A protein has these predicted regions:
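The beta1-alpha1 cofactor-binding region of Rossmann-like NAD(H)/NADP(H)-dependent oxidoreductases
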Residues: 18-29, 62
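Substrate-binding pocket helix/loop in short-chain dehydrogenase/reductase
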Residues: 55-57, 64-66
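Active-site loop immediately N-terminal to the catalytic Tyr-X3-Lys motif
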Residues: 58, 107-113, 170
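Active-site helix of classical SDR
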Residues: 80, 118
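Alpha-helical segment proximal to the catalytic Tyr-Lys
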Residues: 85, 131-134
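Residue(s) in the substrate-gating loop at a strand-loop-helix junction
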Residues: 102
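C-terminal helical subdomain
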Residues: 142-143, 161-208
Length: 210
């Protein structure tokens, strides 16, 4: 409800449609409604994601692993697949798929095997879509964000575990900066693509992590 209210008064208004990205039937229904309402699809931003309990590898429940994979990886695939189908068949042909990756697509944080594995997989999916989409003017990009100041990212300002076992407060960036990065990627002509962009707090301990 909170998300749906964000763009309700904008002109043109932003329509919110509830869907379970991990459910194939729900995703098909979502994209069918988009196609029926607007006639075409130019941009998909795969932004749904979740973490898993930060516990030792041998303590992570199978259900927690599967839930993270279902939303982060399978959900992104199902949405990309549905978008690809529309973009391939529409006229003019083409479109752009932008996947929300993560700094964790490059280097893990301690006790994050499920999240890290899915984000590494997103990188492989991005490259494959970029390759398979060439023939249909479908571009695919990935945005890897480090420490956005959101309700979830607020934990960085309170201290998070580091690879050396220490707890460190990390800097964050305004989430609006991430939005501007997505908007720039989306604004490019289809013959131009940013395959991968990393946006992060300048002083976050990422380079050299691991």
């Amino acid at each position: 409800e909170e998300t749906a209210s964000f763009g309700a008064t904008d002109k043109p208004a932003i329509t919110a449609i509830a869907a379970d990205v991990a459910n194939g039937a729900s995703v098909k229904s979502l994209f069918s409604e988009i196609e029926n309402s607007y006639g075409r699809l130019d941009i998909l931003f795969n932004n749904a994601g979740m973490g898993a309990p930060r516990v030792e590898l041998d303590e992570l429940a199978e259900d927690a692993w599967r839930n993270c994979v279902d939303v982060n990886l399978t959900g992104s695939f199902l949405c990309a697949q549905a978008a690809f189908k529309i973009m391939k068949s529409q006229s003019p042909q083409g479109g752009r798929i932008i996947n929300n990756g993560s700094i964790s697509a490059h280097a893990p944080r301690p006790n994050t095997i499920a999240y890290t594995a899915t984000k590494h997989a997103i990188t492989g999916m991005t490259k494959t879509i970029a390759l398979d989409g060439r023939a249909y003017s479908i571009a695919c990009s990935q945005l890897d964000i480090g420490n956005a100041d959101t309700a979830i990212g607020n934990r960085f300002t309170k201290g998070v575990p580091q690879a050396n076992g220490e707890i460190m407060v990390e800097p964050v960036i305004e989430s609006d900066e991430c939005g501007r990065a997505v908007a720039y990627m989306a604004s490019l002509p289809l013959d131009t693509n940013i395959l991968n962009m990393t946006i992060m707090a300048t002083n976050m301990p990422f380079v050299g992590r691991g």
